[in-house]
Amino acid sequence: MIERYSREEMSNIWTDQNRYEAWLEVEILACEAWSKLGDIPAEDVKKIRENAKVDVARAQEIEQETRHDVVAFTRQVSETLGEERKWVHYGLTSTDVVDTALSYVIKQANEIIKKDLERFIDVLAQKAKDYKYTLMMGRTHGVHAEPTTFGVKMALWYTEMKRNLERFKQVRKEIEVGKMSGAVGTFANIPPEIEAYVCEHLGLDAAPVSTQTLQRDRHAYYVATLALISTSMEKFAVEIRNLQKTETREVEEAFAKGQKGSSAMPHKRNPIGSENITGIARVIRGYVTTAYENVPLWHERDISHSSAERIMLPDVTIALDYGLNRFTNIVERLTVFEDNMLANIDKTFGLIYSQRVLLALINKGLAREAAYDKVQPKAMESWETKTPFRTLIEEDATITDLLTKEDLDECFNPKHHLNQVDTIFQRAGLE
């Protein structure tokens, strides 16, 4: 991932240095496991643990000759050891090391993403509580429907991200898995005890069955989950972009002192952060196809997935980490124009209360069809003539014979739409 959309903590996880360090830890743990079985002298393992070092530049130099990164790595590590070097990579195949270490690196990335998600959820919870009763226009098909509250909108985002957190916890169980089962997964030259020891010490589960590789359905599920999380963020970002339109202006991204919105138009204050999140989500989603195409490897393995994963896995984790942090800050600092929200409710001449009038007439004894046929023409006339809907209702004696002024006051009271907000928040776990 390019530096512009990267945070240092996550980027450092995907460096060659950290990857080789993970490989080395797998190699050393395997030696320790062999020692516990009595196959490698404990003193040799001690020397390997104390003296084995990674030198990325040297390993890459050797790779120019070997054309094999793991062989180059083991030879470079061996250069830092004495006679005990013979035990490095003992009984292992390259993918025992690479796949297990990759899962370990992903686990490190997951710890950061988990913190990102939890912080975002906390910010959404606070925003929901802050604006719990802040009335605003609810829109369906982009058209005014009925009032809701900005807090309910935030509660919706909160519950969606809670679901995403649960999905993330589940996919961690699938992806944080190692394997050290040999060339075709049969443990022909390495006992299962080695795998169990290494995985336990790395905080990984051991794959019950594997070939030379971990199966890539795990990685496809993982990338798809990250893509879904990013798509939820995009959904929220698109909402902010729509609500920041000049004609609506119910919210606005924070605009810093000295910030510029346009090189040509000095007045511009654009939702560039939310637009940025939209683009990042597109990038992450684009990798889902790659992840799925990596699943059908040939027989017990091929390496067609390898080149794709070297690009894909750093990109999706770095991009999601960046996106979660940036969007959390956007939501946390979001300006909410409560007066504009109320003003927008009144823009449609009271038409948004048409269902309340319809239900009131039904409650007075009219059949639904008859009530609908009384209300709809008044609503259409209000649209076309820009006459307040209530005025047209009050001018119709066939309606006012059934509905008193008090009845109409209740129909046209926006606070009616707050009646179940407490219930919604309780159901969302926000009380």
Swiss-Prot record:
SUPFAM superfamilies, per database record? L-aspartase-like
Q: Where is the active site?
A: 141, 262
Gene Ontology cellular component annotations, sorted alphabetically = cytosol
Pfam families tied to this protein: ADSL_C, Lyase_1
For this UniProt record, the keywords arranged alphabetically read as follows: Lyase, Purine biosynthesis
Question: Out of the domains of life, which is the source?
Answer: Bacteria
Record-listed E.C. numbers = 4.3.2.2
Reactions the enzyme catalyzes: N(6)-(1,2-dicarboxyethyl)-AMP = fumarate + AMP; (2S)-2-[5-amino-1-(5-phospho-beta-D-ribosyl)imidazole-4-carboxamido]succinate = 5-amino-1-(5-phospho-beta-D-ribosyl)imidazole-4-carboxamide + fumarate
Task: Return the InterPro entries for the record.
Answer: AdenyloSucc_lyase_C (IPR019468), Fumarase/histidase_N (IPR024083), Fumarate_lyase_CS (IPR020557), Fumarate_lyase_fam (IPR000362), Fumarate_lyase_N (IPR022761), L-Aspartase-like (IPR008948), Pur_lyase (IPR004769)
Q: What does this protein do?
A: Catalyzes two reactions in de novo purine nucleotide biosynthesis. Catalyzes the breakdown of 5-aminoimidazole- (N-succinylocarboxamide) ribotide (SAICAR or 2-[5-amino-1-(5-phospho-beta-D-ribosyl)imidazole-4-carboxamido]succinate) to 5-aminoimidazole-4-carboxamide ribotide (AICAR or 5-amino-1-(5-phospho-beta-D-ribosyl)imidazole-4-carboxamide) and fumarate, and of adenylosuccinate (ADS or N(6)-(1,2-dicarboxyethyl)-AMP) to adenosine monophosphate (AMP) and fumarate.
How this chain assembles, per its entry, is: Homodimer and homotetramer. Residues from neighboring subunits contribute catalytic and substrate-binding residues to each active site.
Protein name in UniProt:
Adenylosuccinate lyase
